[in-house]
Curated annotation (Swiss-Prot):
Postsynaptic neurotoxin. Residues 1-22 form the signal peptide. The lineage of its organism: Eukaryota, Metazoa, Ecdysozoa, Arthropoda, Chelicerata. This is U4-theraphotoxin-Hhn1r. Coiled coil: none annotated. Expressed by the venom gland. It comes from Cyriopagopus hainanus (Chinese bird spider).
């Protein structure tokens, strides 16, 4: 009985890990199908970091508290930078 339970739990864990890995590969392949190379993704990341920090600096120069600019598409503004959620 104990061995059967361990075998069932082990199979369930392997199935969950396999399913998760398959979903990651599928999501990654869909991103690559869009045709956006890694260099373009890096440029987008740098652009988001820059925009968020610049907007906070501009608000500080106007003698106002720095209100964090809202970042879109799974990003949030933290420490004057857009970071992935």
């Amino acid at each position: 009985m104990k061995v059967t339970l361990i075998a069932i739990l082990t199979c369930a864990a392997v199935l969950v890990l396999h399913t998760t890995a398959a979903e990651e590969l599928e999501a990654e392949s869909q991103l690559m199908e869009v045709g956006m190379p890694d260099t373009e993704l890096a440029a987008v990341d740098e652009e988001r970091l820059f925009k968020c920090s610049v907007s906070c600096e501009i608000e500080k120069e106007g003698n106002r508290d720095c209100k964090k600019k809202k970042c879109k598409g799974g990003w949030k503004c933290k420490f004057n930078m857009c970071v992935k959620v």
